[in-house]
């Protein structure tokens, strides 16, 4: 029986009649063998202590200072500016396997993975070779190509809810399209989202959102008119009764419920065992659609995503990150009768200049092929559980209040007593302490997401040695702070 790993987190992975929900403070441990076909990784060239002696960010500081004169805040996505953790943002020069190298020559074990896409490891040789071949034919066609058919077939065969799929260029685009589609299909205006869940930066979703909005402590965003969010209803994650109340209050008006089946943009927050099944039941009873935002969890928790892992099939699904293998991509798909409303098959308009880009399709195809290999998810399962439990054990040993957990290649931890059920719980975390921990780990050659409110990721390229080094560094830093 698979279980979510971590202190305060333990329950079965499938929702079946014969299983009893488990929720407590006892850690659970995985029992599986690592894959023998992990990607090659760059080896550390110095010990942790040696690295710290030579650690400098002088070149990154100089480059970032110039960047702030050229781009708002010096970055093209807010969390990269390190505002929530403090210190100097690192400027990356190259990546390979489980490692990143900055322009100062510092090397890091990477647990961000480009925010999720790098599940087979950075700059995989097979993917790079395939991209080189595709590039010989051109970088953008603006017309149909066979690669779109291939990736579409792979996605449809993998994801339980998807009978037809539309490729776009980002997770935000996917969520924008699926929202419009849900409203068009149901002829209803309102949607329910959950506090702390992030579905991109489109206006209707910037209400009690997670990700960068949570990181910066913003309740919403200036420039979003009330008219854009008047039909967006919110509820606390894992709160079934709140959703029932919203449907009762807005009878016949709610088009869909959209959620992250595992929250990753308010930190790592898994669903209670009964939560997803209850939301599926409520939406069916009210003729509303259920949308899983699997931009983060798709192909990460299982080859068929969180919906395969938990055994709950939504009506519509959004994807991104992994299906582009590190190139810009997004997708939304679902039941055929719903998807046939999308233009040109139907009247709901959505388009994109670079949608179905041949390079993104190529990277996605070869990434998914690698994920079909034997032992893929067992490897992710094992190393991620060992990483998370190792960090939590180090926290306990050094006297810090910490909680967290993992599912397959996704994990997170909070500097707070657990369990964490929703965004309100997550906000009790000691973010100042997380910042000190983060900066200490960076000096030790470990790169986590620069925010307490972001999940972490492992890859097929991560090795037992990576995990051991990370846990040892964590214990050292936790003693110091």
UniProtKB/Swiss-Prot annotation:
HAMAP family: HemL_aminotrans_3
PROSITE patterns: AA_TRANSFER_CLASS_3
Keywords: Chlorophyll biosynthesis, Chloroplast, Isomerase, Plastid, Porphyrin biosynthesis, Pyridoxal phosphate, Transit peptide
One Pfam family this sequence matches: Aminotran_3
EC number, UniProt record: 5.4.3.8
Protein name: Glutamate-1-semialdehyde 2,1-aminomutase, chloroplastic
Compartments reported by the entry: Plastid, Chloroplast
GO biological process, one term: chlorophyll biosynthetic process
Pathway the protein contributes to: Porphyrin-containing compound metabolism; protoporphyrin-IX biosynthesis; 5-aminolevulinate from L-glutamyl-tRNA(Glu): step 2/2; Porphyrin-containing compound metabolism; chlorophyll biosynthesis
Statement: the UniProt record of this protein carries the keyword Isomerase: yes
Annotated catalysed reactions: (S)-4-amino-5-oxopentanoate = 5-aminolevulinate
Swiss-Prot/TrEMBL cofactor(s): pyridoxal 5'-phosphate
Keyword Transcription appears in the UniProt entry: no
NCBIfam families per the UniProt record, alphabetical: hemL, PRK00062.1
Assigned protein family: Belongs to the class-III pyridoxal-phosphate-dependent aminotransferase family. HemL subfamily.
Superkingdom of origin organism: Eukaryota
InterPro entries reported in the protein's UniProt record: 4pyrrol_synth_GluAld_NH2Trfase, Aminotrans_3, Aminotrans_3_PPA_site, PyrdxlP-dep_Trfase, PyrdxlP-dep_Trfase_major, PyrdxlP-dep_Trfase_small
Ranges for region Disordered: 18-40
CC per GO annotation: chloroplast
UniProt GO molecular function: glutamate-1-semialdehyde 2,1-aminomutase activity; pyridoxal phosphate binding; transaminase activity
Subunit structure: Homodimer.
